[in-house]
Amino acid sequence: MIRNFKRTAAIVGVVAASSASLVACGDSNDASTNDTTAAATNADTATNDAAAGDSNLTGTTGQLVAEGATSQQNAMDYFGARYAEAVPGANLAYNATGSGAGVKNFIGDQAAFAGSDSPLKDDEVQPAADRCGGNEAWHLPMVIGPVAIAYNLDGVEDLNLTVDNLVDIFKGDITSWNDPAIAEANPGAELPDENISVIYRSDESGTSDNFQKFLSAASDGRWESSGKAFPQAVGAGANGSTGVAEQVKAIPGAITYVEAGFADQAANIDFGNGPVELNEETVGNALDGLEFETEGHNMVVDAAKLFAMDGADTYPLILTTYEIVCSAGYDDQTRDMVKDFLTVALDSQDEELASEGFIPVSGAHADRLREAVNAIS
């Protein structure tokens, strides 16, 4: 089960305690609906000086178009509403089409920034720089959210799964809930003789990419697949975070990987030192050890080190969603709107964001993010 997490603000304190090593990001809604976050409809392009107020906003109005990860849709909804309040006449249109599509359309100059659960691939770095007028594209992890192993198993409220169990389930080597390997992880539990229905993301997804990185790192390479496209040999696909979550709710015996805010019931995971419940404390313990591959304003999380954590009471299956932005090269209006929106997002790392299952950033990492936003030119 997910206790004291999905609807709690207590995690804010955990992040404050671990802020010396944290950066945030998140993801969002179902791509099939192509929903957008539109918190205001006035697309006037004048500058609203009064909106700048005490928040150091430019007050530039218009529609800011962004696209990408479905995992952060709920966060974008919230940030977009706050943005419209802070800058009357401005609105965010966030298309939750998945990380892959977001990066593609950012590079294609169809979106001002991309939401992605994975950093740019090596062969995307130069095209992104070209899109930015020859300037570097930065990764700004603005939203962090744990990934849950969501399941639908009647009568089993507390389910323990080892990393090996997960690898074997998603490879199709374990096909029944009363398999001896699962029973061994759940002593005394009455597991039903019921088929396991694997549900995976059918769209190109940063969540899939990170989940596969986790499976590989945590199992010493037993999981061999990688990338944003999840293997389709086992189970059935669904589009977006909402899609996989709804499929699990509808299908008895189903299992999937999805952001915690979308999961009603989540398994405890044994990362190597006993089952670990997904809650604010265990996630905070993992965030204490978060490291970065890069310095300066381009903030790429070292996912390999994160996913290899196996400490007791530590839940390292955490999704960091990047807002991929141009460090420079925007036209003046777009630059100012991007900076205003990201500033509002940083000002909105609060209890309401936590209530949606995300982890608000604070302390040193929030400061580092704010410095990066201010440096966009």
Feature map (PLM): residue ranges:
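Bacterial N-terminal signal peptides that target proteins for export
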Residues: 2-12
